[in-house]
Design a protein with these regions (language model features):
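Metallocofactor- and cofactor-centric catalytic cores in central/energy metabolism, strongly enriched
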Residues: 1-169
């Protein structure tokens, strides 16, 4: 094994998971087991991101509006402020202080096109992939949506999680 003695006693801003993995982020996932839930995932995204403080800044809307106004008023392209978009992007950053849950770094909304029809092997592969996401050390927790009628069932997902980590919490 490599000599790691020079790093003994050092710390970093991270999260140690119960299985020994270490993450540098604390994200929550919203995952559907079937593509029929994708619309619900999108509705949740629209409702949650802004209200909980995780919405990305709308970097370009104002700049595009200004460019359109200038264009429609007859100004030539040479007089349009090309630097405005870049300046706006540089000044925008996510404001962690506005988050309802300050120790949660983000909410990730995943969608896919599987889970319903197809073969059982397809459903098994999907559940294995989703279990990998759930087991990632940067994931603090998840909300899993299921209709109950799809091939990719919650017990199948639980089995795949257990294969990756029998003590998953």
């Amino acid at each position: 094994p490599p000599d790691v003695s020079r790093w003994e006693g050092r710390e970093f801003m991270g999260y140690k998971r119960s299985d020994g993995q270490v993450g540098t982020l604390n994200n929550w996932l919203i995952i559907p087991l079937v593509f029929c839930e994708n619309r619900n995932v999108q509705i949740l995204r629209e409702a949650f991101e802004k209200e909980l403080g995780y919405a990305q800044p709308d970097l370009y809307r104002q700049s595009v509006r200004e460019l359109v106004d200038q264009y429609t008023s007859g100004k030539s392209i040479a007089h349009m402020p090309h630097q405005a978009v870049v300046d706006q992007e540089r000044s925008s950053s996510g404001d962690a202080s506005s988050r309802v849950f300050p120790f949660l770094d983000g909410i990730k909304f995943l969608t896919h096109e599987g889970g319903c029809g197809g073969t059982r092997e397809d459903a098994q592969s999907l559940c294995s992939l989703l279990a990998g996401y759930l087991h990632h050390p940067n994931v603090a927790g998840a909300t899993v949506l299921s209709l109950g009628c799809q091939n990719a069932q919650i017990n199948m997902l639980q089995e795949e999680i257990e294969k990756k980590n029998p003590d998953f919490d």
